[in-house]
Each structure stands twice: as C-alpha cells, then as structure tokens.
Amino acid sequence: MIKRTHTCGELNKSNIGHEIHLNGWISKSRDLGGLIFIDLRDRYGKTQIVFNEENHTNAFNTAKKLGLEDVIGIKGVVVARPEDAINKDIATGEIDVEVNEILVYNESEPTPFDINDRNSAMEDHRLRYRYLELRTEDLQKNFVLRHKVTQAVREYMSDDDFIEVETPILMKSTPEGARDFLVPSRIHQGRFYALPQSPQTYKQLLMVSGFDRYFQICKCFRDEDFRADRPVSYTHLTLPTKRIV
C-alpha cells in the first residue's frame, strides 16, 4: 500500500522537484511509444502522470498492461510541463508526475459506459450502475456543492442564534396534503408509524417548549405521483421563530 502524500487535485508549480505519492483511478491513458501518459483521478481532481521507458523500465512495463478504471498507487517526482502542454482547465495543468514506482491495487473489467462522458449512456443504464455514475465529475461536483450549501446554512443560522434540532423520522400519521408512507410496527401488531411529510408537529412542540429560534435540514416524504416538482422524498429547510423581534 502506498500512502498518499497529496490528492490528485492539489499539485502545482510549488511542488516541482518534490517526491510525492498518489492513489486513484485511471481516467485516460495514452501510449506514445517510449512514454505513457495517464490521467489519474480521485474525488479531488486529476493529475497527469508519466511513465518513461528509458528512466523507469519496470514501472513503464506495468503501465502498458493497465486499463481504464484500474486502481493504482504511484510514487514519483513532480516536473513542470512544457509551455505548449499546459492545461489551464484543471488545477494541476502546469505539472506532470514522472513515475518511478507503481502498485496496482485492483484491475477493472470494461465499464458499461464511458465514465468520462455521462451522455454516452441512457439514464436507466447509468442508474443500473449508479456506483460508477457517482464517479463522474458532474455528479461529484453536485455533492460538493450540496455540502457547501448546507454548511453555509448551518453557519448562517448558528451565527443568528438559531440552534439545529433533529426531530424523529417515525411519527404518528397526521393528515396533510398527500398520503403518508406507512411503516409497520414490529412490537405493536397492526399499528403503523408514518414517515413525516413535514416536521410540523415537532416544530410546534419546540416553539411551545421555549425554543424560539430553531432550524432543521430534514428529509420529508409524500406518497404521491412522482413529478419533476413533486419528488416522493425531498430535503426540507425549516426555520420557525417564536418571536420576530
């Protein structure tokens, strides 16, 4: 196992000349004879790594056998790219890593669609292989954006003296705008819990109890026909205040 010293998205000109270790998936591979260029990918970005047959024959011979989505670890030295090879579209576009040692963790079978291009397959096909689709750059950016938004909400609300309270996910069925999703009780035979359409009941309990500023980012569920603006489950931000002034 090669313990990484950096991620695939953080190397730049300040690292030139340094020995570094990376782990990741093979995103692209180009064999130019005595040189093999590979785009190594992890959650943080991509780094182009280079295998030179003349300088490191063993690593080069291993690289010739690699396929897309193989998982590898490498040791190498950061070098500057020629001016005409700089890629300004990625954070690591000014450098390469010349590999002197490689360890193959896992070899991949051919993937059912091109992970570098989500549009290469229909949605149903991608969903069947969701664990592969989640490797795509677009979806990973969506997850990062969602994380940043929820963190910003939490920081903003906390700075304004709101506290975050997590309310129960199983509750008594209460009439609202849609049907409830029901969950049978194992202990109380013939009785059911309901998944909340909103945390309304618990909001009112908290307000009456004196929690005049609370917020919650919670999952809500509505058993109704699925539409683009009416998913059966969605994330809800609620921020009731007992007193405005």
What spans do the regions from the language model cover?
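Conserved small/polar residues in nucleotide/adenosyl-binding loops
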Residues: 235-241
